[in-house]
C-alpha cells in the first residue's frame, strides 16, 4: 500500500529538481513518525524530519538542527530591572538533552542565537555551555547569530554560513533561488496565527518559501516570541507535541500560487 500523500503545490510553484513534499517512506518509517508526531519531508535526496520539540533531524549525517535558544534572556532582562521567568533555560537544556538521548546524533548544529546577549552570559550559564557537548554526547557547532556577537563561548567558536549536502545552513535568511540548495535558517522565529471569530492563537511553525528555496525553523528557546509568516509560506504547526501540516485556505487553494 502506498503511503498517504499530503496535498502538494502545483509543479509551477516549486523548483522542478528540488522539492518533494512527502517522501516515499516505508510503512515502518511512516508509522514511527506518525506515532511520535513528526513529519518526514524531502528536498531532492535530502530527507529531513520535523520534530515537535521545534528541531530538525537530518538522518543521513545524524545531525540535529536547532536555532534561537536565546539562553540567558531572563538574566539579561533582570540586569535591566525587568522581571522574567527564569526557568526557560532549564527547559531548553532538558529538551535538547532528551532529544540527543533519543536520537543519538553525531552533531548538534545551532543555527545562531545560542545566547541572548553578553549580559545574560552568567558564570552558571558559561558552565552549562562548557558541559553541553558531554551532556548531549556529541559535538556542538554554532553558526553565529546576531545575538551571539561579542560573546566568548569556550569551545564554541562562531562559524559562518555553510553548505551541508544539498542544504545551505545560516542564521539569518539567505535565499537560494538560483541554486539547487535549500536554505535552512533561524532568526525569524516563525509562527502562524489561527483565527476563529474574535479568538486567535499563535503557534510556532516550520515555514517553507518555495521561490526563495528556504525553510525557516521555529525558535527552540522558551522566551522567544515570534514573527507571523505570511500567506506565501507553507506551514507545519507545532501543537500538542505534534507537527501538524496546515494549509492556509487563502494561500494554498488550487487557484493560488504557493510562492512569489
Kindly give the residue locations of the regions a language model identified.
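Extended recognition/assembly regions associated with phosphoester-bond processing machinery
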Residues: 3-4, 19-111, 116-260
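Short linear segments in intrinsically disordered or otherwise low-structure-confidence regions
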Residues: 2-7, 11
Amino acid at each position: 500500500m502506498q503511503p498517504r500523500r499530503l496535498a502538494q503545490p502545483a509543479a509551477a510553484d516549486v523548483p522542478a529538481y528540488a522539492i518533494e513534499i512527502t517522501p516515499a517512506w516505508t510503512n515502518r518509517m511512516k508509522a514511527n513518525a506518525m506515532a511520535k508526531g513528526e513529519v518526514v519531508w524531502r528536498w531532492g535526496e535530502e530527507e529531513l524530519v520535523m520534530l515537535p520539540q521545534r528541531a530538525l533531524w537530518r538522518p543521513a549525517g545524524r545531525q540535529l538542527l536547532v536555532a534561537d535558544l536565546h539562553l540567558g534572556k531572563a538574566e539579561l532582562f533582570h540586569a535591566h530591572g525587568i522581571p522574567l521567568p527564569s526557568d526557560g533555560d532549564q527547559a531548553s537544556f532538558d529538551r535538547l538533552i532528551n532529544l540527543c538521548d533519543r536520537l543519538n546524533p553525531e552533531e548538534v548544529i545551532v543555527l545562531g542565537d545560542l545566547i541572548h546577549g553578553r549580559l545574560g552570559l552568567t558564570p552558571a550559564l558559561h558552565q552549562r555551555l562548557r558541559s553541553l557537548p558531554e551532556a548531549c554526547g556529541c559535538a556542538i557547532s554554532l553558526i553565529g547569530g546576531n545575538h551571539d556577537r561579542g560573546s566568548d563561548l569556550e569551545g564554541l567558536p562562531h562559524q559562518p554560513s555553510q553548505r551541508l549536502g544539498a542544504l545551505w545552513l545560516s542564521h539569518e535568511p539567505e535565499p537560494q533561488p538560483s541554486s539547487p540548495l535549500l536554505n535552512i535558517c533561524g532568526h525569524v522565529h516563525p509562527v502562524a496565527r489561527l483565527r476563529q471569530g474574535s479568538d486567535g492563537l499563535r503557534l510556532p511553525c516550520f515555514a517553507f518559501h518555495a521561490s526563495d528555496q528556504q525553510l525557516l525553523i521555529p525558535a527552540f528557546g522558551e522566551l522567544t516570541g515570534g514573527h507571523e509568516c505570511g500567506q506565501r509560506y507553507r506551514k507545519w504547526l507545532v501543537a500538542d507535541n505534534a507537527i501538524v501540516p496546515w494549509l492556509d485556505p487563502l494561500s494554498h487553494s488550487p487557484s493560488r500560487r504557493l510562492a512569489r
